Design a protein with these regions (language model features):
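Generic helix-packing signal
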Residues: 1, 45, 49, 73, ...
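Catalytic loop of short-chain dehydrogenase/reductase
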Residues: 2-50, 61-65, 89, 122
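Short, small/polar-rich loop/turn modules that mediate ligand/substrate recognition or access, typified
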Residues: 9, 53-55, 111-113
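Short linear Ser/Thr-Pro motifs
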Residues: 11, 67, 105-108
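Short amphipathic alpha-helical segments
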Residues: 18, 26-27, 70-72, 115-116, ...
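A glycine/serine/threonine-rich, flexible loop-to-helix segment
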Residues: 51, 61-86, 95, 126-138
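C-terminal helical subdomain
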Residues: 58, 76-111, 116-120
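C-terminal tail/cap regions
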Residues: 108-111, 115-138
Length: 138
């Protein structure tokens, strides 16, 4: 940040995952690092905001097949579970790219220091009918 590389009203966006706030099996170190990333975004959001009016946000994306994610034991289960829990279904990588572009636009000029969930509603659902059906006796 000391290099003065950002233009005024610029935007910085990082990708994270809700495991930064919740427990997910076998996501241990990655979850710790995502929590740290979200904290850095808040800290730098304040610094860059006051110095250059630069916005700093994180996007908490649906579980998405990536090189990093493929190394997490049971990751396919995360994807299937989130799909069953999300009213709108999982957001794809392309959906995330489109959403990210909006954070670089002037339409989000006053959005900063936020962790924005982009997960089809998964982060706010306690339990879905699709998941409950798995536990119901027939």
């Amino acid at each position: 940040y000391k290099q003065d590389a950002m233009n005024e009203w610029g935007s910085i966006v990082a990708l994270t995952y809700m495991a930064a706030q919740r427990s997910f099996p076998d996501y241990n170190d990655m979850a710790d690092n995502k929590a740290y990333l979200e904290s850095i975004a808040r800290s730098f959001g304040y610094f860059f905001g006051t110095e250059k009016k630069v916005r700093v946000n994180t996007i908490s994306q649906s579980p998405t097949p990536t090189t990093a994610g493929s190394g997490v034991k049971g990751f396919d289960g995360f994807i299937a579970y989130a799909e069953k829990m999300s009213p709108l279904g999982n957001a794809t990588a392309q959906d995330c790219a489109d959403y990210t572009v909006s954070l670089f636009s002037d339409l989000t000029r006053r959005v900063t220091m936020q962790n924005l969930f982009h997960d089809g509603g998964f982060s706010n659902v306690g339990v879905s009918n699709a998941v409950m059906e798995k536990f119901m006796e027939e």
